[in-house]
Amino acid sequence: MPQQKKEVLVFDLNKTFYNKSSKDEFFKFVVSKKPRQAKYYLQMLYYELLLMMHQIRKTEFKENFFNYLDNLPPSQVEAYAKEFWENEFPQNFNKELLNRFKVARDNGTELFCATGGLEVYVKPLFNLFPISGFAGTQAEYVNGTYKVMGKACKDEEKTRRISKHYGNFGFTIAEAYSDSKEDILEEAEKAFLVEDGEIKPYPKNSKT
């Protein structure tokens, strides 16, 4: 008898489930612990400008934006992230989405977060809100800095990572939520765009 496909609800993190941008908020938190890391602020603005001008790839942006984590080993970043998310969850998360996700999970739908954030600081969140799967931008700590492994977890890379997670089991994206018009919304049976906390049905083939 063939295995039944997993029914999956996929969601983005930043400005979708989490009301803010975790990369910016986590920087503020790290600076509160290590004030010297504030020296990276102007550098971060520079790389954001390059990204907006399409002068830098998303993977290269991720690797350079997170230079503020330099000389902080994974164990330290994870400890900071644990405290950070304990301060943020659940009060700074989209309450309607939180309720939707809980209902879906109780009904047997698997929850999967696919985000461009670095896994090293995002992962501790899901000790507070358990889900079935998670994919973020992977990085390794080499000589005091974080180097992105492969591609940033954006666009088609999200789909690839979800497929890798489920392997031979097969899956159907029953619902997808994001704050941007991305590939994953086109692939879902039901897709929703989150704009300033408001959840709106996403019309297919509207990605520009």
Feature annotation, model-predicted:
Residues 1-53:
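Active-site neighborhood of HAD-like aspartate-dependent phosphohydrolases
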Residues 2, 6, 79, 86-208:
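C-terminal cap/substrate-recognition subdomain and adjoining C-terminal extension
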Residues 29-32, 83, 190:
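Residues within well-ordered alpha-helical secondary structure of globular protein domains
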Residues 60-96:
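Metal-dependent phosphoesterase signature
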Residues 35-36, 47, 56, 74-76, ...:
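Conserved alpha/beta cores of soluble small-molecule-handling proteins
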Residues 48-53, 59-74, 129, 134:
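Short, compositionally biased "basic patch" segments
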